[in-house]
Design a protein with these regions (language model features):
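Functionally engaged cysteine thiol sites
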Residues: 34, 59, 93
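Glycine-rich beta-strand-turn "strand-cap" elements at beta-sheet edges
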Residues: 1-4, 40-56, 81-108
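Residue-level signal for secondary-structure boundary sites
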Residues: 19-21, 65-67, 104-106
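Short, well-ordered beta-strand segments in beta-rich or mixed alpha/beta enzyme
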Residues: 7-14, 43-75, 108
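Vicinal oxygen chelate
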Residues: 63-65, 79-84
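Short amphipathic alpha-helical segments
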Residues: 19-44, 75
């Protein structure tokens, strides 16, 4: 594993039925704000086979501390209230995990 201090944030999201479009439009607005804070969206995935309404994100974040500071930036953004309301309406459940590459994995 390289000496890169970056870690990855694996986000598992379960959407409310029929709210994918609201969620996707809101994420499209919020993602650039996170990227300005040093995050990089490695990929956003929805299963072709598997749990309906699931969405998975993998973000590269500069450090574990960078997660909280970037979320503070999002909370302070002028559109934060609107984003919060859209996510409250569209997300049924969300789980976040900070992960590091394994010794046998190529780092994206």
């Amino acid at each position: 594993m390289p000496d890169d201090p970056a870690v990855y944030l694996h986000v598992k999201i379960q959407l409310v039925r029929g709210k994918y479009t609201l969620f996707a439009e809101t994420m499209a607005e919020m993602a650039p704000v996170l990227e300005e804070s040093g995050w990089r969206l490695i990929g956003a995935f929805a299963p072709a086979i598997g749990r309906l309404g699931a969405v998975y994100h993998v973000w590269r974040v500069p450090s574990p501390d960078g997660v909280l500071s970037a979320l503070d930036v999002v909370r302070g953004h002028p559109d934060a209230r609107r984003w919060h309301d859209a996510f409250a309406e569209s997300i049924a459940d969300e789980a976040l995990e900070l992960v590091r590459p394994t010794t046998y994995s190529r780092v994206p």
